[in-house]
Amino acid sequence: MIHKHKTGINGFDIWVGEEMPSGNYLILGPPKVGKSIFVNQIAYLSALAKRPVVYVTLDGSPENIKWRMKEFNWDVEPFEKGNLFQFVDGFTFWYAYPQKRSSEFSVESLTNISKLLSVIVEAHNKTGSNGIIILNSLSTLLEHAEFQKSYSFMTGLKALTEERNCLGFAVLTSGMHPEMQINAFKHIVDGIIEMQFQTEKEKITRKIRFIGLGTRLNLLNWREFTITPDGIKLAPQMNEPQQRKNIQNSNPTPKKPNSTLHS
């Protein structure tokens, strides 16, 4: 039976029909459009709702990711202590001193795809069943491992999310990789959450769309979103049923941070 998940993001769950089915999803967009904020927000809100989270961090150390999340008042350290939130550190060995690794789960090489997958499985075993698995980012994996290895990894990650009824997200930066490679990843995932910048009447806005969610063809249309001190919020749609607009969102209202990082 396919498990269904809420992201907790303001406006997003209503847009996709309240819940997303288990599967592997690609988060695709240009630099600084909000991809990392999107997955960080999902990670925090999932743990807050007592859904297990495994966060594979290749673009920064776990400490750096936690610092960025705290900019939005998303503190995951209490969930780490309760084994509800596990980082898999694929960054520190490559870019910092190995002795500084603080995560229980880590990998020493991004070219050993089998090892990376096995460590993710170990981390997920500790958090429990279902839940969320985040890879941030697939672009960094491609920089270290050849395309075929990265594709094999995504095949393995897809199998893992299906076997364990997880919701998987892999972040990929557009403009960094050949179109053939991007299309190959689009082919293997269950859906694509695409983000972009758009210029309308000299005003730059952020837009999002969802490709590959069954018959919800209206999700192919671009929808505006903003990055606020509370995280990502989707702009209201005129055609949304009124009763859906009245559903109370589970996103808490954190204190306004001193600064935000739009990555």
Where in the sequence are the language-model features?
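Conserved catalytic network of the ASCE P-loop NTPase/AAA+ motor domain
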Residues: G17-M20, L45-A49, E77-E80, E122-T127, ...
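C-terminal regions of RecA-like/P-loop NTPase motor modules
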Residues: M1-I2, L217-S263
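Phosphate-binding/switch loop-helix module in NTP-utilizing enzymes
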Residues: W94-G156, E162
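Walker A/P-loop NTP-binding active-site region of P-loop NTPases
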Residues: W15-D89
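Phosphate-binding/switch region of NTP-binding enzymes
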Residues: C166-L167, V171-G231, N239
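Pre-Walker A adenine-sensing motif
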Residues: K6-E18
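Loop/turn-to-beta-strand initiation segments
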Residues: P52, N83-L84, S129-I132, E163-V171
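Flexible glycine-/small-residue-rich
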Residues: D89-F91, S137, G212-G214, P236
